[in-house]
Amino acid sequence: MASPGGAALQRHAAVSVLRAAAAACEFSAGKAIHAQMVRAAHFDVILHNHLISFYAKCGRLGLARQVFDAMPSRNPVSGNLLMSGYASSGRHADALALLRAADFSLNEYVLSTAVSATAHVRSYDMGRQCHGHAVKSGLADHPYVCNAVLHMYCQCGHVEDAVKVFENVSGFNAFAFNSMINGFLDKGKFDSSISIVRSMVGEVEQWDHVSYVAVLGHCASTKELVLGSQVHAQALKRRLELNVYVGSALVDMYGKCDCACDAHSAFEVLPEKNVVSWTAVMTAYTQNELFEEALQLFLDLEMEGVRPNEFTYAVALNSCAGLAALKNGNALSASAMKTGHWGALSVCNALINMYSKSGSIHDARRVFLSMPCRDVVSWNSIIIGYAHHGLAREAMCVFHDMLVAEESPSYVTFVGLLSACAQLGLVDEGLYYLNIMMKEMGIKPGKEHYTCMVGLLCRAGRLDEAEQFILSNYIRADVVAWKSLLGSCQVHKNYGLGHRVAEQILQLKPSDVGTYVMLSNMYAKANRWDGVVKVRKLMRERGVRKEPGVSWIQVGSEVHVFTSEDKNHQWINQITRKLKELIDQIKVVGYVPNFGVVLHDVEDEQKEEHLMYHSEKIALAFGLIHSPDGATIRIMKNLRICDDCHVAIKLISLVTARRIIVRDTVRFHCIEDGVCSCDDYW
């Protein structure tokens, strides 16, 4: 029989070996100690606890549970070790099951672990029970327990309960502070988050780097540039702007506050840049529509040896969407496939967006159908993509599939759905979605939905109803809704109403160039040339200048940009010859220049030249020169395509046997054999 001193020495040696084996994950060494303990009948609580810790750290939770269940007696550490093992392995339900059957006393460590587990599984009821137990046992004020309870309430969406706990926190608690801000931001309660920030400004010296990240996240979400700059100044004093997490948060804040240059400056000072900081600065550029710069940063990132993650790919793909750079998007898709990121939800959603906005809706559908899982963004992207391509029936079918899949529609879903209804003139269906289905789903209609309804009534030819709809809803001051009605007045030749609507728009926005253009067009179509002259005079008096039309087209890997009347391009001689050739060809099949869209007070011959050099025609000629016969031409434009270009491009598609896709600010125009997918209504 071993002496008491010898037994203690053996136990100490066993504990040392188990600790070392757990740290190195040496399963065989720890297992051997367990076997020796069984043979020597060493079964005190301390040795059992070390065995539980060893098995848990080696990922053998089944064996850890066997040791726990075989213990003749336990202390709080026993339960906490097993619960922590479950929690660390993501088995939060098992941790909570252990808590329910607990026959050991609960201390602050056990309770904080249990509450954290309820947060992970979003079990609000169980979390409240744990909180109640903490209150009864006098442990609710312990920092570990208090912080875990705050985090649990925020994670479960019960921020009001978290506020009650936070208000009873004594002194400054950085973790509690951070949890509250992030909880409010997750729920979109920005007013509440700013009140928390202001209450803690006096404790800024005690903020940790997580506090700075949380506050900067608030500033980014609310575009609080002044506060964000002040927080930046405090970070500079403590040299925290060099911390990669704080630095990345600064980049994100400046980007969302429309300060791309400041975002880049915050990025440049970082001594160590990781994929998070690279992605943050790319996002800042993309949010500020600096798409080419964002794609260049992606190339720089790869040159620096930083491996892009799924979010980096998503940002780069969204930049391609902004440029409608289909070839670059395809290259990124292939790269994501090679690096194993292609199936990620964020990447697939970005691919759907990129293909939709690049005029390749069939590829968008292919990605959507191949996704292993989808979220509401996936469904919204394909619905809106179909709607913008004039595929209204397909959009409505996808919406039906969305309901069958039990995915809850969002505010954005109904914008796409109502846009689809508008293209088909389905008034009754649109009113049903707006007044009944959205109400049943708890979604309050916004101005985007009401504007879609205006377009829907207009498409059905019910212009007077559309006017009354605008006047009877809170969109009566919304220029977009009135312009939708104005465009329909032009299509339906209701020039009397159109004149009244134009006056309404110009009262709201006297500098709206598009309204002057449409008003001039209506006067010209009605042979009211005195009205055209009047519009031109009014524009001169008010100093209103037509925004230059800009169109771009991708040829090879390069995006070529053209402005209206652009005669300085290196290919302008070839482009001019091609344009004259095309105009001669389409005149044979019925093209007549529409001088009504020309606001210049010049002779007809000069007006025809102005029309010929519209940016989309220049881009089209360039595309025809530099693409093989039969290839699809894709053109993007910064303004609504004018009536003359729309007619001309339809006829060019006929005489060249080309499929031509034009994306303007309203929709996609898929033109083939002289017919446009918009049915001449846009």
Question: What kind of feature is each model-predicted range?
Answer:
Residues M1-W682:
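Terminal (and in a subset, N-terminal) low-complexity or junction segments at the ends
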